[in-house]
Every structure is written in C-alpha cells, then in structure tokens.
Amino acid sequence: MKQYKILLFIADGLGDRPVTKLEHKTPLEAVEKPNIGELLKNSIAGLMDPISPGIVPGSDTSHLAIFGIDPFKYYRGRGAFEAIGAGARLKAGDVAFRGNFATVDNNLTVIDRRAGRKVDEAKDLVQELNSKIGEIDGVQVKFYHGTEHRVAVVLSGKGLSDKISDTDPHETGVKVKKSEATDDTREAKITAEVLNKLTNRIYDILSSSELNKKRIERGELPANIVLLRGAAQYVDLPKFYDYTKINAAAVSATALIKGICSQIGMNVVTPKGATGGLDTNYIGKAEEASKLLKEYDMVFLHLKATDAASHDGNIDGKLYAISMIDKMIGRVLDIYGSELIIAITGDHATPVEVKEHTGDPVPFLLYVPYNIVADNVDDFNEKQLRKGSLRIKGLDVINLLLNYSYRYEKFGA
C-alpha cells in the first residue's frame, strides 16, 4: 500500500465564537477560503477538544496532546520548552521560566505586561542582563531572547526546585508578585528567594538602561522588568519517531513550539522573516514546508498570528491571518501537489472578544487524496463543522494521520 506524506497545519488560537462586529459570524465564517474549500470536498471533518471537553488548554499541553504525548503524564511546566526553543541547552536540575519584557512604575505596579509588545531592543536588553547578572546567591542565571517581547530565563545550580509561584501577576494595575514556594521543601524556598532577588536586580538594571531611556524619549514604554512564570525543570519526552516511525520536521518561529518539537526529535526550521506575529512571512513558511515534504514523512507547520491577534482583540488582524492560512495552503498545493494527507486545526480557541484561551472545541479537517466517504460540510468554520463526523480529542490526531497515510501498525492479530 502506498504511504502518503503528511502536512499537519496548526493555527494557534484558531477557534473562536460569533463576533458582534462581524454580524455574529465567527472569523472563520467571515473569510473566504477557496483553497481549504477545495480540500473539504474530500475530507473528513468536525471538531476537536485539544485536551478534553471544557478543559482550557495551554499551547504547550495542547501541542503535546496533538503530537500524541499525554500531557497529564509528562507535563511539568512551560518554562523548559520556552528555554529550549530560545536556544538553551538544559541539564537535569536546571529550572527554566518563560517571561515577558514588561513595563512597571516605581512601585513595581504593572502598567503593560508586554511593554507595548514591540520591543525592538529585546536582544540587546537580554545581552545587557547577561553581562550584568551572572549569578544570584551562587545560582547561575542566563537569559535568552525568544520572539518580540518574550524571554526565557534559566537558573542553574544545586538544590533548585520548580515548585514555586510566578512573579507575573497576569494583569495590569497590580504589583509584581513575590515568588513563593508551593511545597515545604528547602529547595523550593531557596529558589523562590533567588527569583525574588533576581526580579529586583532586573528592575535596577533595566530602569537605568540607556536603551530604555531612548525608548522613553521616543514616547515608547520602557521594558524595565521581566515578568516570570511557568517554572519547569527538564523532563525527557518520548521521541516522535519512536512511537510513530515517522521522520518529521517542523516549521515555526515560536520559542515554545520550537522547544517542544526539538525535544521530541523533530528537525525545526525557522524561515527568514518568520516572526511569530501578524507580520510573519506566511508564504515563506508555506514554501519551506513544501520543500521539507520532499525530504520528510511529515511536516508540522505552525502559525502563531491567529493567536496573537486574538489576545490583542484585533478582529481585522485575525481575519487577515485566516486569509493568509488559505493562501499558505494554496502555495503548498502549488508546489507539492495534492498527493498528501493534510490536517488543519487549532491548538485551542482564543475568541477575539474574550482575548484569552477557552475550552471550546476547535475546527478540524483531514484531507486525503483518494476515495473516502467525505463529510458533507460546506465551509471550514465552527458552525459548519458541527455537521462533520468527527468529535475527537487531541490525542486522537496522530492515530488518524497514521491510519489515512497508511503508516499504521495493526492492533492485534
């Protein structure tokens, strides 16, 4: 039996709800998608619960599930994935965090959790922090830039713990939180103390940074703090090839996703101009995926722009990103052709009016290039896909891909 190549396209935060300004259509309903519409004619489709109905997924736990890795068994926290994706090489005992460059006032009250989101000086600020903070109380500290305002921090030393709380309050108008131990161990208490000292040191350095003085002169918010969250120690994950026998590559610009994919053994490629934002190189990513399909059994293509727009409440931005998804699919079909399996879905819903993740199911489409009993679905959107035959969980996705690509192993005799 011929085995087919696989394209798995995940648009971050794709799922949505009816939007008042769109005459109560969802963003997917409001955008014409001719290329995806053609795929629907020979697809099975429906809705997917990334974790389980009603559970609000993080992008980390949902991607693990979609890749066939049970997050309830393996998930320890997001920080390690972010750090690996940003270029860190973690070792046992290290504690990693994800963070944002943010803006606070003199009392450490948060004004903007993302410092206006646009922090062109982020790499230079990271370099400045690394040059001025080598260690805190004997614990080695290293900063890594991710994308835009995002940063990862790694603590290295003996006797550290990831059982500590965030310094990020997750809202504005309140003070930066003090990290606290979440268990009674000495290691957790020491790590929380180090993190609090680190936070104060970061503020002192960034507040006096010439780079931030220039930002203020330009009328921009200073990036004068790093809000930290998602403490996690390194955990070995199953390798994708070991449980699928599929050689896979990933196309992504997002540190978290790059970290997960790297850790499970995918070859990660970030094309020139891919940013993880609305200004990303959409077509360049599609072209890179098409090229990789000639070399690998499966290519995972990730797009962050839909989620970024949703978190900002940017309706027009989400509509634009969705229109570009259709163009990306069209570009893959132009270059590689249609003789492959294509799955299109989201990792979670981020309704543009809510601006946060929700536990809503997300759209799911699986196109095959041969005769199947296709679903009678007219459009790729949240309402139409309720007519489809599928209501699956994230952990089901890999099995579906293996089955329809004829790469499965029989269960039983």
UniProtKB/Swiss-Prot annotation:
Pfam families linked: Metalloenzyme, PhosphMutase
Pathway connected to this protein: Carbohydrate degradation; glycolysis; pyruvate from D-glyceraldehyde 3-phosphate: step 3/5
Signal sequence region: none
Reaction(s) this enzyme catalyzes, per UniProt: (2R)-2-phosphoglycerate = (2R)-3-phosphoglycerate
Gene3D superfamilies for this protein: Alkaline Phosphatase, subunit A
Protein keywords: Glycolysis, Isomerase
InterPro entries (alphabetical): Alkaline_phosphatase_core_sf (IPR017850), ApgAM_prokaryotes (IPR023665), Metalloenzyme (IPR006124), Pglycerate_mutase_ApgM (IPR004456)
Enzyme Commission no: 5.4.2.12
Domain of life from the UniProt record: Archaea
GO molecular function ontology, one term from the record: metal ion binding
GO biological process: glycolytic process
Cross-referenced PANTHER family: COFACTOR-INDEPENDENT PHOSPHOGLYCERATE MUTASE, METALLOENZYME DOMAIN-CONTAINING PROTEIN
Family from the record: Belongs to the BPG-independent phosphoglycerate mutase family. A-PGAM subfamily.
Function of the molecule: Catalyzes the interconversion of 2-phosphoglycerate and 3-phosphoglycerate.
Protein name per UniProt: 2,3-bisphosphoglycerate-independent phosphoglycerate mutase
Gene: apgM
